[in-house]
């Protein structure tokens, strides 16, 4: 009986979803929340999947309820939200910032990219005339449960 319990625990542990990046960082499954009509949200999810993360894509009627549930400050809200381990991810946060978050494990609630900056993952814009990308610099903001914010990363084209 003890052995069968051990076997069940090992089977459950082996089924836990996580990804290993090139840097060998253990990354838990991402649980994403978005509206059905959001195309840029799908592109952000593909950005994560293309970088080896497992993403559960939840279509929800009321994305604002998720933002309230995870205490995302109003001024940082964007079109989609996600949970990765104990952290909340809001908006078009790039994989590099997510990896940094999981490496450093700061005492924060999560990261956000306010608005929808051109060139952030999912917000790439291609010019038909020049076939080049139109990117802008943006900041990845860390936030705490109390609503305190600080710059976590600066992203430049």
Describe the function of each predicted region.
Residues 37-39, 57, 72:
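Short alpha-helix boundary/capping motifs
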Residues 37, 44, 59-62, 94-98:
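Stable alpha-helical elements in mature extracytoplasmic
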Residues 12-26:
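Ser/Thr/Pro/Gly-rich low-complexity linker/stalk segments immediately outside membranes or between
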Residues 23-51:
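Local sequence-structure signature of Cys/Sec-based thiol-disulfide redox active-site neighborhoods
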Residues 29-31, 53-55, 85-88:
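Short active-site oxyanion
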Residues 45-65:
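Conserved helix-turn-beta segment immediately C-terminal to the redox Cys motif
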Residues 69-157:
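Thiol/selenol-based redox catalytic cores and closely related redox-interacting motifs
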Residues 1-8:
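Hydrophobic membrane-insertion alpha-helices, especially the h-region
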């Amino acid at each position: 009986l003890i052995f069968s319990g051990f076997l069940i625990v090992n089977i459950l542990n082996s089924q836990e979803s996580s990804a290993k990046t090139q840097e060998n960082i253990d990354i838990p499954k991402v649980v994403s929340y978005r509206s059905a009509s959001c195309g840029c949200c799908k592109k952000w999810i593909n950005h994560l999947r293309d970088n080896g993360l497992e993403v559960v894509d939840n279509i929800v009627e009321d994305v604002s309820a998720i933002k309230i549930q995870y205490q995302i400050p109003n001024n940082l809200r964007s079109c989609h939200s996600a949970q990765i381990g104990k952290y909340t991810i809001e908006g078009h946060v790039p994989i590099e910032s997510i990896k940094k978050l999981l490496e450093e494990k700061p005492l924060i609630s999560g990261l956000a990219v306010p608005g929808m900056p051109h060139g952030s993952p999912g917000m790439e814009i291609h010019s038909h005339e020049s076939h080049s990308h139109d990117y802008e610099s943006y900041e990845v903001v860390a936030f705490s449960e109390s609503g305190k914010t600080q710059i976590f990363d600066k992203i430049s084209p």
